[in-house]
């Protein structure tokens, strides 16, 4: 029984000890963006533009960890990006407008519906 308690305690301590390393690896900042596509733009039409923005710009930025996107009904769109830091997320936004893929991406979005929030772990 004492061996079991020792092993259990060791496992718990190891789990807590690696949590900060896992958080850094997975990104400490979660960026959530929502928007609506312009009238007449389908999810099938927009999806390749969304993938191009990720591939050609976002994924190449310092501090990028991961990105996923999904569409809802009526042109709703959701993008979740994980960054290592707020500084990395802000730096990416500062260069986004200049990215070649961004122009086509933004041309299909209704600007007044765009919302971005950042959360920290």
Show where each model-derived region lies.
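Phosphate-binding glycine-rich loops and adjacent basic patches that engage nucleotide phosphates
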Residues: 12-17, 50-56
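Short, surface-exposed ligand-recognition loops at beta-strand->loop->(often short) alpha-helix junctions
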Residues: 36-49
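Short alpha-helical
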Residues: 41, 74, 87
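An amphipathic, aromatic/His-enriched active-site/gating alpha helix that lines ligand/cofactor pockets
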Residues: 51-65, 82-118
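Positively charged n-region of N-terminal signal peptides that target proteins for export
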Residues: 1-5
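Intrinsically disordered, low-complexity segments enriched in polar/charged residues with Gly/Pro
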Residues: 24, 43-44, 54-57, 67-68
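Glycine-rich beta-strand-turn "strand-cap" elements at beta-sheet edges
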Residues: 7-8, 13-14, 18-30, 35-38, ...
